From Swiss-Prot:
This is NADH-quinone oxidoreductase subunit N. Signal peptide: none annotated. It comes from Wolbachia sp. subsp. Brugia malayi (strain TRS). It is a multi-pass membrane protein. Its main location: membrane. NDH-1 is composed of 14 different subunits. Subunits NuoA, H, J, K, L, M, N constitute the membrane sector of the complex. InterPro entries: NADH-Q_OxRdtase_suN/2 (IPR010096), ND/Mrp_TM (IPR001750). GO terms for biological process: ATP synthesis coupled electron transport. PANTHER family: NADH DEHYDROGENASE. The chain crosses the membrane at residues 6-26, 30-50, 66-86, 98-118, 156-176, 194-214, 226-246, 261-281, 289-309, 317-337, 363-383, 391-411, 432-452. Belongs to the complex I subunit 2 family. It catalyses: a quinone + NADH + 5 H(+)(in) = a quinol + NAD(+) + 4 H(+)(out). Keywords: Cell membrane, Membrane, NAD, Quinone, Translocase, Transmembrane, Transmembrane helix, Transport, Ubiquinone.
Length: 465
């Protein structure tokens, strides 16, 4: 076994453990900076050690190839952005906060490379357990404690469902290795027990993604958790789970399951965008609103993925990348607002007080809504094109209607910024965070000029599936 190939994972877990010990010596700000630095180093090592050919370390517990390394890179970049927001923000939590983020990042990068039901479940739990603590990290806030308890309770239920699905899959096949499962499913008739087991595993994944009808936890947890945690929840775990689902359905891991899963995935993705569109209409809390928004965006990604074509896969990844950039840009401002009072009213009148900031926030919101010629428009255009080319015209119309409805709540925020009276809330504006917001906004503006290049790059990565 070449130890160079597993150096990113090795460095990630060792650096997390070392920083956990160093927290006793150094102050929390230093640990936060070191956590950011270690994640950047992990990304650099990953880039330098990446290879096109497949590699199966630890007796095939993991699989490493170009697609998996690219997915891990996306996860680490999203994690770096959240850690950057943490270092630039008002938050002064205990040093364990950034360490928990490092542990969950390690769980995510091993999750997307898992090649065995056991390694997959262990990675899934290593990703999940720190998230429970992060959601309830603000002990002084009853909302944060409530969010942690709700998330833990429902996540435990979803983990049990997933574990039961894995036991069914093992019981009917006698296998746990993904490659061996693929060969078994290709050469044997699919029984209802196997299909039911796979459905239960999918339910567990859909819960973490907050896909309808397993979305009920998201609005309460997003609202109650510290805003920096909400920023993490809405981006990094979604990157990990979406990239794993792409490998799950489009790779060699599970062959022949498309006909069983396509109708289900299409229906729940349509349900997600409709619940998102109507559920967010009456929300005045920004974090609850973005929770419903994320349900809809993941619905778009899942719809494109459920087509089971290369174009659909590429479109879902483009959408994911643009969604992460836009979300980070929005949260770079929202984390400056009080965690327990993150309402739309706090944005009232900033179009007059801080016109440049309001402009950049408007660009990001327009992109979220899919207004041309911003990056969000092209992301949705690729999704619609994938659906139409595959013959799902009726489904495309549902998504178009949901997109039009969702424009209302994005525009209501812009209306508050420019036309409502300035609020009395005292927000301490950070110049550093303003730069993050501006960069995310500018990326959304200029990306339409090179969206084809991004598509070609993603297509090159997915060819290795």
């Amino acid at each position: 076994m070449s130890y160079i190939q597993i150096l990113p994972e090795t460095f990630s877990i060792i650096s997390s453990l070392v920083l956990l010990l160093l927290g006793i010596v150094f102050n929390r700000r230093t640990i936060n900076l070191l956590a950011l630095g270690c994640t950047v180093i992990t990304l650099i090592i990953l880039i330098l050690s990446a290879k096109d050919s497949g590699f199966f370390p630890f007796n095939s517990l993991l699989k490493l190839d170009l697609y998996i390394r690219s997915a891990q890179g996306l996860i680490l970049i999203a994690g770096i952005l959240v850690l950057l927001l943490l270092n630039l923000s008002k938050y002064d939590y205990e040093y364990e906060f950034s360490i928990l983020i490092l542990f969950t990042l390690f769980g995510m990068i091993t999750l997307v490379s898992a090649n065995n039901l056991i390694s997959f479940y262990l990675s899934f739990e290593l990703m999940s357990i720190p998230l429970y603590v992060l959601a309830s990290f603000n002990k002084d806030s009853v909302y944060s404690c409530e969010a942690g308890v709700k998330y833990f309770t429902l996540s435990a239920l979803s983990s049990c469902i997933m574990l039961y699905g894995m036991s069914l899959l093992y019981g009917y096949t006698g296998l746990v290795n993904f490659s061996e499962l693929s060969s078994f499913l290709e050469n044997h008739q699919m029984t209802y027990g196997i299909v039911f087991g796979l459905v239960l595993i999918l339910i567990g994944l859909c819960f973490k993604l907050a896909i309808a009808p397993f979305h009920m936890w998201a609005p309460d947890v997003y609202q109650g958790a510290p805003t920096i945690v909400t920023a993490f929840f809405s981006t990094v775990p979604k990157a990990a789970l979406v990239t794993f689902l792409i490998r799950f359905f489009m790779g060699e891991e599970l062959v022949g399951v498309e006909k069983y899963f396509q109708p289900v995935l299409l229906y729940i993705s349509a349900l997600s965008v409709l619940i998102s569109a109507f559920g967010a209409l009456r929300q005045r809390n920004l974090k609850r609103l973005l929770a419903y928004s994320s349900i809809g965006h993941i619905g778009f990604i899942l719809a494109s993925l459920s087509i089971f074509t290369r174009m659909g896969t590429d479109s879902s990844l483009i959408y994911l990348v643009i969604y992460i950039i836009t979300n980070i840009g929005l949260f770079s401002y929202f984390i400056q607002i009080d965690d327990d009072d993150c309402s739309v009213a706090n944005l009232s009148g900033i179009g007059k007080k801080r016109p440049v900031l309001a402009f950049h926030l408007s660009i990001l919101l327009f992109s979220m809504a899919g207004i041309p010629p911003l990056a969000g428009f092209f992301a949705k255009l690729f999704i619609f094109k994938s659906l139409v080319n595959s013959g799902f015209i009726g489904m495309s119309l549902i998504f178009i209607v949901a997109s039009v409805i969702s424009c209302y709540y994005y525009l209501s925020i812009i209306k508050a910024m420019y036309f409502d009276k300035p609020s009395d809330s005292k927000v301490i504006y950070s110049k550093s965070l303003f730069i993050v917001t501006s960069v995310a906004s500018l990326i959304n503006i200029v990306l339409f000029m090179c969206v084809e290049d991004l598509y070609s790059l993603i297509h090159l990565v997915t060819k290795s599936l």
